[in-house]
Every structure is written in C-alpha cells, then in structure tokens.
Swiss-Prot record:
InterPro entries on file: Cyt_c-like_dom (IPR009056), Cyt_c-like_dom_sf (IPR036909), Cytochrom_C550 (IPR029490), PsbV_cyt_c550 (IPR017851), PsbV_cyt_c550-like (IPR016003)
Gene Ontology cellular component terms for the protein in this record: photosystem II; plasma membrane-derived thylakoid membrane
Gene Ontology MF: a single term: heme binding
Name of the coding gene: psbV
HAMAP family according to UniProt: PSII_Cyt550
The protein's name: Photosystem II extrinsic protein V
Complex and partners: PSII is composed of 1 copy each of membrane proteins PsbA, PsbB, PsbC, PsbD, PsbE, PsbF, PsbH, PsbI, PsbJ, PsbK, PsbL, PsbM, PsbT, PsbX, PsbY, PsbZ, Psb30/Ycf12, peripheral proteins PsbO, CyanoQ (PsbQ), PsbU, PsbV and a large number of cofactors. It forms dimeric complexes.
Cofactor binding, per record: Binds 1 heme c group covalently per subunit. PSII binds multiple chlorophylls, carotenoids and specific lipids.
Protein source organism: Thermosynechococcus vestitus (strain NIES-2133 / IAM M-273 / BP-1)
Positions that bind heme c: 67, 118
C-alpha cells in the first residue's frame, strides 16, 4: 500500500512540475527575438509570431529535406548559421539576401548560378515545392532561418552532435 502511495505522489509531483514549468522552458518569442536584419545596410524588421510560425511551417515543407536543423546535407561545411550566411558573397544574413538567394541561388562565393541543383523560384519547374511560394512566403522562410539561431543557439546548424 505504501508503494502505491509513493508512486502516486511521484506521479502527481511530475504532473504538477510539467504544468508549472512546461511553458517556462519554451522559448519566448519576444520582439527582440523576432527582430532580424532586413538588409545589408543595417535596417531591421520585427516579424510577427504568425510570420515566424508560417516561415517555420514553410521551411519544413520546402527546405527541411536538405536543411533539417540548419545543416546542409549536400555540403556539411555550409550550414545556415548566421556567421556562415554573413560570410557568403553576397551576404545572406538578412531577409533580402535570403529572399534573393531563394529566387536565384548562387555558389557561396557568388560566382556561379546554381538554380539547376538548388531549389529556387527560378527552378520551380525542376523543384515543384517552390512553385506556389510567394514573396511573402519567402520572407517568412528567411525570417525563420534568421530567428532559429536566437532560439536554438549552437543547435541550429550544429549537426548530428545536437540531435
């Protein structure tokens, strides 16, 4: 009988802990977290929570098969971390840079167009998931890519060691 009471008390404590601490452990989508660079001139934009969540959904739909967790399966040395995006030519660490890339992708050094091998609006005939994406959708996806490092830290683009 005592064992049953102890297990019941433990289960009750775990349930209470989950209800009280569950939301405290979740990432807060504050305006600071949702504020990301708009362009390379230093302007910023604050996404709405709805934009961020839509970007996350669209990223899962159109991008995550190759970029799950911010990595690049086809080229592990190029991830979606902010630092990596900033070093690209042209820089892709802002909304406009990422949207431009999703329209017409180029190599990391910016020398060659790679629309034939990387999904983009330009190659929507080859990559059907890109067909129905609008400019608004691309902004939401770019916003998601730029917000994730603020939420996940080193896990975003960190690879297998974090999953």
């Amino acid at each position: 009988m005592l064992k049953k009471c102890v297990w019941l008390a433990v289960a009750l404590c775990l349930c209470l802990w989950q209800f009280t601490m569950g939301t405290a452990l979740a990432a807060e989508l504050t305006p600071e977290v949702l504020t990301v660079p708009l362009n390379s001139e230093g302007k910023t934009i604050t996404l709405t929570e709805k934009q961020y969540l839509e970007g996350k959904r669209l990223f899962q739909y159109a991008c995550a098969s190759c970029h799950v967790g911010g990595i690049t399966k086809t080229n592990p040395s190029l991830d979606l971390r902010t630092e990596t995006l900033a070093l690209a030519t042209p820089p892709r660490d802002n909304i406009e840079g990422l949207v431009d890339y999703m329209k017409n992708p180029t190599t990391y050094d910016g020398e060659q167009e790679i629309a034939e091998v990387h999904p983009s609006l330009r190659s929507a005939d080859i990559f059907p998931k890109m067909r129905n994406l609008t400019e608004k959708d691309l902004v939401a996806i770019a916003g998601h890519i730029l917000v994730e490092p603020k939420i996940l830290g080193d896990k975003w683009g960190g690879g297998k060691v974090y999953y």
